[in-house]
UniProtKB/Swiss-Prot annotation:
Family statement drawn from the similarity comment of this UniProt entry: Belongs to the ST7 family.
Gene: ST7L
Membrane topology according to the record: Multi-pass membrane protein
A GO biological process held by the record: negative regulation of cell growth
Species for this entry: Homo sapiens (Human)
Region of interest (Disordered), residue spans: 125-147
Keywords, sorted A to Z: Membrane, Transmembrane, Transmembrane helix
Pfam families: ST7 (PF04184)
UniProt keyword Transmembrane helix, yes or no: yes
Designated name of the protein: Suppressor of tumorigenicity 7 protein-like
Length: 575
């Protein structure tokens, strides 16, 4: 019965809209009629306009007006056509400059966008845009949209900085805002997810903090945190907010996080004892677990920044053992960076063996750290001249393949590691395979690549070879899925405006822009040469017409126009 029911549902989904109960059976022919009328509307208007002109030809004196226009056109001199050509070239050049600026800023042609969005429906292009609810085209559109959403998923930066002690100090020094509103809004949503639950109304301090996480103004959030501490001196989330946003040094932030840890552990033990009483208590335990893990992780990051790296590694290992389900927080990336700072490369390899798995999501930290370890074994003795003369060894081939794998996953990282682009403070959220992830990785890992002698040299010699293996990265990848086309838009939302977002693959100018540029330039050049050297250009044009139009009437007519141009030019010169 279950299988039979499943087949019935599949048949109902694949059936046409008219055969599915509950759908309007007249929807299909109405849409088709509307599309047909839209397609023939332009032709009907054209025929009606011709008929109206024929009926009004005598009252409007169309014949006399047409004769006057003909006389006016015949009286125009060649100088007028030269000036007209120059003016049209100037206008076309201005249009080209605007088109180039629009394409450079928005990544699309303005004329093409207007044509597709506004002119195509008027020219009868609405039929192709109408698809039935169960048609394959509609299914493909839905599948593509779901794929784009999954590709453009934004992740919280595992190594994000402290707002008060790092981001705000940067603003004080440079006057620039390193975080965008979109990035901070995502952080506010994360805080509400991690630090709030349905039982917050039971404790007044949690109610105040629930409002504080939704507050946009930083001073108002800090004020709300102090109000929560007045109501409950053991409010862990209030200490977390103060450590993140009010503390101006890492030492102050660590002190507040230690107070938060003391309060968070007490609340966590109480929640563990009551977790089986009701679903609300289970939700409260999940919230208190998130708070405790967040506090310990930030304490580990404080210890890492203050030079107590072994202490930071111990805290991270304990977290990963105590809360293994929370791998989504990517604590292993914090651990990898700390182990690299200790130069504990065997431990780094052990972590990679666990997390660089085909079933787990990849990241720039995973791929580039794996490439760094393989590069480390050969980079010291690597020489491009020697390699080209004797060929690559097995270890060198493995290192080059690891670099190609990492570059395919995120092609923006090498420019930052090789210092071809300047680094900025990483955002609080990153887009995997995007420029934001590249900045976040290079900001913390550049020193580890510099520490290994020859690693950057090997990277510089081999990273561009990746692009020969994936000539069409948006359509087909080599080791990963095709590169998502939505990274540029998402990165522009995550990164500040003063940063030049890296784009991959490089967008080429449309053929229309190249054609417009060539046409405008050549027309303007011909107009200038004709104005300055009428005799030479006349001989050149006569030769061209002789090649393409060998009829005698064409050359004789052109000679008359050339003689008129010469006589008028002489008359102007003598005057």
């Amino acid at each position: 019965m279950a299988d039979r029911g499943g087949v019935g549902e599949a048949a109902a989904v694949g059936a046409s809209p008219a055969s599915v109960p509950g759908l309007n059976p007249t929807l299909g022919w109405r849409e088709r009629l509307r599309a047909g009328l839209a397609g023939t509307g332009a032709s009907l208007w054209f025929v009606a306009g011709l008929g109206l002109l024929y009926a009004l030809r005598i009252p409007l004196r169309l014949c006399e007006n047409l004769a006057a226009v003909t006389v006016f056109l015949n009286s125009l001199t060649p100088k007028f056509y030269v000036a007209l050509t120059g003016t049209s070239s100037l206008i076309s050049g201005l249009i080209f400059i605007f088109e180039w600026w629009y394409f450079h800023k928005h990544g699309t042609s303005f004329i093409e966008q207007v044509s597709v969005s506004h002119l195509q429906p008027l020219m009868g292009g609405t039929e192709s845009s109408i698809s039935e609810p169960g048609s394959p085209s509609r299914n493909r559109e839905n599948e593509t949209s779901r794929q784009n959403l999954s590709e453009c998923k934004v992740w919280r930066n595992p190594l994000n900085l402290f707002r008060g002690a790092e981001y705000r100090r940067y603003t004080w020094v440079t006057g620039k805002e390193p975080l965008t509103y979109y990035d901070m809004n995502l952080s506010a949503q994360d805080h509400q997810t991690f630090f709030t639950c349905d039982t917050d109304f039971l404790r007044p301090s949690d109610t105040v903090m629930q409002k504080a996480w939704r507050e946009r103004n930083p001073p108002a959030r800090i004020k709300a945190a102090y109000q929560a501490l007045e109501l409950n001196n053991d409010c862990a989330t209030a200490y977390v907010l103060l450590a993140e946003e009010e503390a101006t040094t890492i030492v102050d932030a660590e002190r507040l996080f230690k107070q938060a840890l003391k309060a968070g552990e007490t609340i966590y033990r109480q929640s563990q004892q009551c977790q089986h009483q009701s679903p609300q208590h289970e939700a409260q335990l999940r919230r208190d677990t998130n708070v405790l893990v967040y506090i310990k992780r930030r304490l580990a990051m404080c210890a890492r920044k203050l030079g107590r790296i072994r202490e930071a590694v111990k805290i991270m290992r304990d977290l990963m053992k105590e809360f293994p389900p929370l791998t989504m927080l990517n604590i292993h990336e914090n651990l990898l960076e700390s182990l690299l700072e200790l130069q504990a490369y065997p431990d780094v390899q052990a972590v990679l063996a666990k997390y660089d798995d085909i079933s787990l999501p990849k990241s720039a930290a995973i791929c580039y750290t794996a490439a760094l370890l393989k590069t480390r074994t050969v980079s010291e003795k690597f020489s491009p001249e020697t390699a080209s003369r004797r060929g690559l060894s097995t270890a060198e081939i493995n290192a080059v393949e690891a670099i190609h794998r990492a570059v395919e996953f995120n092609p923006h990282v090498p420019k930052y590691l090789l210092e071809m682009k300047s680094l900025i403070l990483p955002p609080e959220h990153i887009l995997k395979r995007g420029d934001s992830e590249a900045i976040a990785y290079a900001f913390f890992h550049l020193q580890h690549w510099k520490r290994i002698e020859g690693a950057l040299n090997l990277l510089q010699c081999t990273w561009e070879g990746t692009f020969r293996m994936i000539p069409y990265p948006l359509e087909k990848g080599h080791l990963f899925y095709p590169y998502p086309s939505c990274t540029e838009t998402a990165d522009r939302e995550l990164l500040p405006t003063f940063h030049h977002v890296s784009v991959y693959p490089k967008k080429e100018l449309p053929l229309f822009i190249h054609f417009t540029a060539g046409f405008c330039s050549s027309t303007a050049m011909i107009a200038i040469l004709t104005h300055q050297f009428p005799e030479i250009m006349g001989i050149f044009a006569k030769a061209v017409l002789g090649l393409w139009c060998p009829q005698p009437w064409a050359s004789s007519g052109f000679e008359e126009n050339t003689q008129d141009l010469k006589s008028e030019d002489l008359g102007l010169s003598s005057g």
